[in-house]
Amino acid sequence: MKRIVFLLLLLPIITHARAENFRFAQLSDIHLSPKSTHALEDLKRSIDEIAADTSIAFVIASGDLTEAGDRRCLELLKNELDRLPMPYFVTSGNHETTWSESACTAFDKVFGSSRFAFSWQDCFFIGFNSGPFLKMMDGHVAPQDIEWLKSTLDSLKRVAPDTKIFPVTHYPLQDGDVDNWYDVTDVLRLYNIQAILGGHYHRNLLYSADGIPNVLGRSNLHGKDSVGGYTIIAISPDSIRWSEKVIGKTAVQWLALPFGPKAYPEAVAERPSFAVNETYPEVEERWQKKSGVAILEAPALGKTALFYGDDNGTFYALDRMTGQTVWMYQTGSRIKSAPAVYDGRVVFGSTDGNIYCLSENNGKLLWKVGTGDVVMGCPVISEIAGTLAVLIGGSDHVFRAIELKTGREIWRYTGVDGYVVTRPCVYMGKVIFGAWDCGLYALNLKDGTRAWRWSNGSANDKFSPATVWPVATHGRVFIVAPDRVFTCIDAASGRTIYRTKEHKVRESIGLSADGTTIFSRCMWDTIIAMDARSPKPLTIWKTDGEYGYDHNPSMMIEKDGVIIFGTKNGLLHGVAAKDMRYRGIKVEAGTVLWRHKIGNSVLNTICPVSAYECYVTSTDGSVTHIVINE
C-alpha cells in the first residue's frame, strides 16, 4: 500500500508553502461482497481510470468499502487500491463495523488503522470511524476517537494555525445519523474546518454539520446505470469544487464552496433534550463513571462489584456502592462480550481470541482458553453432569462447553455456519443460540451434539437471529430478529409453532419471572407482552413507550415486576410487567413507571438489582448506577 503521512513536526514547512491547485479522488460505498462480482467490477474500472489520471494527487476511501467487513473482501480491496500509483487513505463505514465477524479487527490488520491524518500543501485531512459498533444503532464516534481527534488538531494548531482542515467520516455528522454528532462538532468548530467529507447515502449531498459544510459523495456502484463512478475534489487558492466522475465520461461539477479561513463561533444545531428527567425526579444517578472509552456490552453483577469490558480491551471491576475501580485486567483487544459471574469467578471473551476466567475478588487470571479467532459471544454458566460449565460461541464457528473450575474443554460443536455474538439460553437439557447465518441452534447439553437447527429461510444473513438473547418457557423458544418477525419454536424438535408480523419487532426480547409472558419492543414506540402458552400469537397488552424510532438490541429484563431497558439514544425505561403496586401506587401492566435520559448514545442491556435499582453501560463510555427513590 502506497501512503504518505507527514509528521506534525514537518507541518510548519508544509503548511507555510504557497497553496497551489491540486485534485484528489474520493471513493465511497464500494460494498465489495463475496456474493457479487458487480461491486468488484465497478471498483476495477474506477481504479483503472484514477490510476491513469496524472492530475490526481491522492485518493480517499470514505467507508462502506465492503458489504460486511470480512477479511477476504478487505484484502481484495487492498489489492485493488495498491494498483494506484498515488497514495491512498481509508476509513471504515457502517458495513465494516455493524456486521463484522472479526469485531472490526480485520480492518486494522489489513490497512493499519481506520484512522488517518496527513497534510497536502496547506491542507490537513483527518479521517476516523463514525460507527455503529457491532450491532444496530445510530452512527457513533467513540470517545477515544474524539480525544484523538482533539489531540491531533490541537497539535496541528500549535505549529500551523492557518492550515485548512478536512475531516473525513462515513456518516454525516448530524442528528439521526450519528448519536453524538455534537461532541464531534464541538471539537471541530474550534478549528479552521473547510468541509467534512463523507458518503453513506450513495449520492451527492450537502448537509450542515452544526454549521460546518458536510459534503457527501456518490457511491462507486453503478446501481441502475451501466457503469459506476467516483468524486473528484479540486482545491484552488479560493475555492473547493466537487465533481461527479462517471466512468468514461467527463467530470461534471455539482458543488463549489469558498476556500479560506473559517470560523464557527457558536453551535447552530439543537442539542438533545434532557427535559424528560424533570418529569421523573425520583430517578437518581447515584454515581456515574466516565471512562473515555466505549463500552459495547452489558455489565454483570458480583457480590460487591460490577464487571464489564471496554473497547480498549480492559476488563474492570467497580465497587457497586461507589463506582471506584477495584481492579483492572488488560486483554489484547476490544471486549464485546457480556461477562458471567459465578462461584467467585468472572468469565468473558475478548477479540484477542481468548476466553478468560478471572478471580472475582482480585482479577487474577485463573485460566484462559485460546480459540484462534475473535470471541464476541456472551457466556452463560450452567451445570453439565454435576460440573459447572461455561457455554460460549465465537467467530471460529465453534461453540464450546468449558469447565468453570479448570478451563478444561468438556465438548465442542464445530458445525456453526456463522459467527456467534449472543448470550445462549439453557433449557430442557439444551443450549440454544443464534448465529449470523440465519440459524438458531439447539445443542444437547450433555455432549454438544446438535438436537436441531432452525432457519428463518432467508438468503440474507443480516436477518439472522444472532444478536437477540433467546428466551424459553412452556416447551417453547422465543426469538425476534431483524426480519421483524416474532417467532415461537418448539424446544424439543425445532419445529416452528408460529411466526407473526403483527408487531414490528426487531432484536429486543425478555421473559417474565413466572414464565407466562414474553416481552418485546417494536421499532416505533410500542412495548408488547405476548402470551407464552398460547398456540397462536396472542397479545396480552401493548403500550406506547414514547421512545420514537429505535432498533437498539437492549433485552427486556424484568426484575421484581418491572421491565427495564434502554434505547439507542440513551433513554432508560421502567415499565410495569404486570398489575402491581409501585412506589405505593396501584398500576396496570404496561404502565410506563419512569424514564430517564442518561446520554444520547446506546444503552446496553441493563443489569438490574431490583425494581428500584440497576446498572447501565453505554457506548459513550459511561457506567451509571440508577436508583429510583421510593
Residue ranges and their predicted role:
Residues 37, 62-82, 97-109, 176-184, ...:
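Metal-dependent catalytic neighborhoods of phosphoester/phosphodiester hydrolases
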Residues 212-276:
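Binuclear metal-dependent phosphoesterase catalytic core
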Residues 319-323, 359-362, 403-407, 444-448, ...:
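Short loop/turn segments that connect beta-strands within beta-propeller blades
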Residues 598-630:
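Blade-level signature of beta-propeller repeat domains, shared across WD40, Kelch, NHL, RCC1
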Residues 25-44, 66-68, 96-110, 132-144, ...:
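Acidic/histidine-rich helix-loop elements
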Residues 280-300, 327-342, 367-385, 395, ...:
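Extracytoplasmic beta-rich repeat domains
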Residues 13-76:
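N-terminal active-site segment of His-dependent metallophosphoesterases
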Residues 49-59, 137-213:
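His/acidic metal-ligating clusters that form di-metal
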